[in-house]
């Protein structure tokens, strides 16, 4: 499963793993859309292996036990895990998100 998540996370400059109906997932994807980022979005509750991918994302976010909070949204920029909602929003407020998106080739501004 780790290889599958890594492959999907590298398919575009920005990849977001979400669940439909998740308000925090909507907040992150809306922010990226407003920044004119065309992210690949994978809704885990609509994927055949979504539960397994969610466990892998939780492991990546919170360590080997995979416990510590929700696994979605999980945001990857340039193939690297950035984090979840709080990390992405904090980076945006500090002015760090746009430069990271530019470096990954997700923005052409």
UniProtKB/Swiss-Prot annotation:
Cytoplasm in keyword set: yes
Entry-linked InterPro entries: GlrX-like_pln_2, Glutaredoxin, Glutaredoxin_subgr, Thioredoxin-like_sf
A GO CC term attached to the entry: cytoplasm
UniProt-annotated location(s): Cytoplasm; Nucleus
Domain Glutaredoxin, residue spans: 2-108
Chief location bin: cytoplasm
Disulphide linkage map: 22-25
Lineage top rank: taxon: Eukaryota
Gene3D superfamilies assigned: Glutaredoxin (3.40.30.10)
UniProt entry tagged with the keyword Magnesium: no
Record keywords, A-Z: Cytoplasm, Disulfide bond, Electron transport, Nucleus, Redox-active center, Transport
Positions of short motif Responsive for interaction with TGA factors: 106-109
A Pfam family hit: Glutaredoxin
UniProt-listed NCBIfam families: GlrX-like_plant (TIGR02189)
Family stated for the protein in its record: Belongs to the glutaredoxin family. CC-type subfamily.
Record function comment: Has a glutathione-disulfide oxidoreductase activity in the presence of NADPH and glutathione reductase. Reduces low molecular weight disulfides and proteins.
Name under which the protein is recorded: Glutaredoxin-C13
Gene name tied to this protein: GRXC13
